[in-house]
Amino acid sequence: YWWEKDGEDLVLNSIKQVCAEQNIDNDRIYLTGFSSGAHGVWYISIRNPDIFAAIAPIAGECVISQQIGNLLHVPVFIIHGDQDGVIPIAAARDARGKLEKLNYEFKYLEIPGQRHTYPTKKSNEILNWFESKKRESRPHTIHFSGDLSHERYIYWIKCTEIVECFDYLDSPPPKKSQESLSNDIDNFHVNECHRIDIKVKENKIIVKSQNIKNMLLFLYDKLI
C-alpha cells in the first residue's frame, strides 16, 4: 500500500529503473492516480517533491495536508466529481483551499454530476497540462517538512546527519475504508520532526532547519 514504506519505495524504485533503462527527461516526470491511487499521489509527491514536474490526483484526498507546503515547486491538477459518494468533494475543495492560501500553482476541475468513476474524457486535458510543466530542479527557495530518516537529497541539498524520529503513518486506514479516508483521517499521525527552509536572496543563502545535524549544499553559478 502507498502508506507503507515498501509501497512508496516500489514507486520510487520503479521511476529510478525506468530512468536508468530508457531515455527519460528527469525534468518531465509526472504522477497521477485515481481514488486510493490519488491518495498515494498526494502522499508520495509531498514526501518527494524534488522528483516530480507536476501531479494530478483524481478523486482522492490529501491525507498529509499539513505538509502540503512541500509542493512549492510542484503544480497540482485536482480533478473531482461533485457527486462522488466515496471520496466526498469536500476533500478536493479542502486541498484547493490550502493551495490557494499558500499561493501555489494549481488547476482545479470539479466535474458536475460525476460520481466516483475515472473521468476518461479528461485524459487528454491532463496529458496536455502535464506537457506544459517542467520540473524546477534548482529552485532559489526550498521548503520541506517530514521524513529525512535516511541520507537523501532535497533538490540541491543533501542531508547527511539528522535526529532520528519516526515519520511513517502510525496506523493504516481500516480495510473497510481504504477508498474513503474522510472519516478516518484521525488515524494518520505524521511526524514533522525534520524541517528545512532555505532562501537565496541578494547573494546570501539563508538556512533554517529543525532536527538536522549536518547537510551539504551543492551550489551552482546561477544560484548566487
Where does each model-flagged region fall?
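A conserved short beta-strand
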Residues: 50-61
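Alpha/beta-hydrolase-fold serine-hydrolase catalytic core, especially in secreted/extracellular enzymes
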Residues: 101-107, 112-224
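Gly/Ser-rich "nucleophile elbow"/oxyanion-hole loop immediately N-terminal to the catalytic nucleophile
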Residues: 2-35, 46-51
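Short alpha-helix in the alpha/beta-hydrolase fold that links the catalytic acid
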Residues: 88-98, 218-221
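Short beta-strand immediately N-terminal to the catalytic nucleophile in serine-hydrolase-like folds
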Residues: 31-33, 58, 79
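Catalytic nucleophile loop
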Residues: 37-41
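Short beta-strand/loop motif that positions the catalytic acidic residue
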Residues: 72, 77-80, 84
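Acidic catalytic loop of the alpha/beta-hydrolase fold
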Residues: 83-88, 116
